[in-house]
Amino acid sequence: LDTTLSDQDRYPLKINDLVIMPINKEFAPEKVIWSNSPEYVITDLQCVGFNGDRFYRPAQQFGDFIEYTGSVMFVDPSGKGKDQTAISCVKMLNGNLYVTECLGLSGGYSDSVLEKISKIARENQINTILVEQNFGGGMFAELLKPFLMRFHPCQLEDVRNNKTKELRIIDTLEPVMNSHRLI
């Protein structure tokens, strides 16, 4: 009995569905083709998923490299305790989502964190920043505004969610990953 088969059905987000490739912050290929053929396995990047999980590079890239059609940064401010502020920069082109930057910042709501977020937004040419409303009722976004005005004026929106974080992550990523559109 191969128990890994049941594990694959139990967990909706699969590492194998990702497309792994170097990403330019300004341009991307018009079309990226995914394949889980053995010749596309990336062997020099450690995969820490289940047994049998692998990272795959694109099977093919078609068309010219063209500018992204949109960009967004999502910020999940650190809560109480020792967690970090999570930041993810995503760009869009032809139905694909390209993660150009993803990191965690220690330091809570300090000026250095707010400045770093603003500079990352500038480096990634972000159009819109979505900030998850935690317990402060929009306080983090208000603290971020003056730094954005100084380093990278862009649209800033508070996002309020009622679902648990894990379910939101799965609901957002599963359709994108299953169709091999997260790069």
Segments from the language model and where they lie:
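RNase H-like, metal-dependent nuclease domains and their acidic two-metal-ion catalytic environment used
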Residues: 1-160, 182-183
